[in-house]
């Protein structure tokens, strides 16, 4: 049995991280990506950004996405709660986030049969307080070295691998 996974990318700063996450998302069969806050996103129909800026951002994302920016459905929201509400309406019933937190559980111990929305956050500050308060679970990747954090795109790829292998 497999579950469907969508991603929520909130307040991620780097176009390279967004592109890399999109590429990993495509590899692991992510169904939809929800962009919120100031996360850069690919070109959209009726884009309200300045045309030269939207094209520049799209080009930077495309460098690391390698085509995934055109293969995964996505939508853009100003606010996290609106993105989560849209995901719920689309059938994603379990809202989880990836973060180091005293309340977190190891990602390899997490198990669900529900389609889920995985939130990842800002490169420096992680996911928002709102996300931590509203997530059904806070998941953490075990680390054993001296560094206490992973790049958001690397962490997302590891999380997607773990979550897609819950039900191989």
Which role does the model predict for each range below?
Residues 10, 36-37, 122, 139-146:
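Short beta->alpha connector loops at strand-helix junctions that form conserved
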Residues 82-83, 106-108, 127:
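Short acidic active-site motifs
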Residues 129-168:
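Structured adenosyl-cofactor binding patch, chiefly the S-adenosyl-L-methionine
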Residues 16-17, 105, 126, 147-150:
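Residues that form or flank phosphate/diphosphate-binding pockets in enzymes
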């Amino acid at each position: 049995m497999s579950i469907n996974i969508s991603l929520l990318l909130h307040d991620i700063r780097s176009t390279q991280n967004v592109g890399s996450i999109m590429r990993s998302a495509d590899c692991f069969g992510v169904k939809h990506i929800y962009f919120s806050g100031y996360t850069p996103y690919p070109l959209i129909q009726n884009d309200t950004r300045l045309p030269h800026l939207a094209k520049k951002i799209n080009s930077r994302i495309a460098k690391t996405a390698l085509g995934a920016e055109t293969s995964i459905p996505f939508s853009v929201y100003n606010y996290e709660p609106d993105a989560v509400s849209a995901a719920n309406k689309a059938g994603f019933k379990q809202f989880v986030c990836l973060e180091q937190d005293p309340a977190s559980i190891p990602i390899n111990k997490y198990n669900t049969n529900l389609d889920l929305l995985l939130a990842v956050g800002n490169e420096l500050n992680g996911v928002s307080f709102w996300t931590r308060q509203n997530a059904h679970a806070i998941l953490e990747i075990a680390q054993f070295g001296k560094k206490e954090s992973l790049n958001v795109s690397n962490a997302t790829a590891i999380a997607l691998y773990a979550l897609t292998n819950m039900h191989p």
